[in-house]
Amino acid sequence: ELGAGVEDHSILLREPLQRVARSVYPIMGVVYDGDRASDTGAQIKNFHHDIKGVDGQGRRYHALNPETFYWAHATFFMLIIKTAEYFCGGLTEAEKHQLFDEHVQWYRMYGMSMRPVPKSWEEFCDYWDRVCRDDLELTPAARDILYMRIPKPRFVLMPTFAWDQLFKPLVGAQRWIAA
């Protein structure tokens, strides 16, 4: 479902930097906006209201399907875990449990059903492994993201070939973390 929504509705593949820049602020707002965090979460949820359709295999999808919305959230959570693992020496089991509990509080701010949310860090690990093993599909959107290039902004005064060479390691690192 997530791949179909990205393919049909997102500008991520056309304007990756702009899409990320527009998303980071509100997503971080759900974590750091204090008393306004639940309002920010509701705003993000509203952004997804009209993201629906039928995928290439004839299956209906909607971004507000609780399983789909939680999976997207779970990928942000695992990005934090993997970034700490790859670049900061990892987290202790106690820190992973704490971060899991915090990610549940973060997710609650969206006002979505809590049904798909695992009850513990251990259940989350089982959930993550199961979804990665049994549910993920190599959709056209996922394939496009694998080969995405970050276009050079007009104001950058360097040749395009140099820009592309500069960002190849960055895009490669992004894929490595996501894997």
Q: For each predicted feature, which ranges?
A:
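Mature, function-bearing regions of proteins
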Residues: 1-179
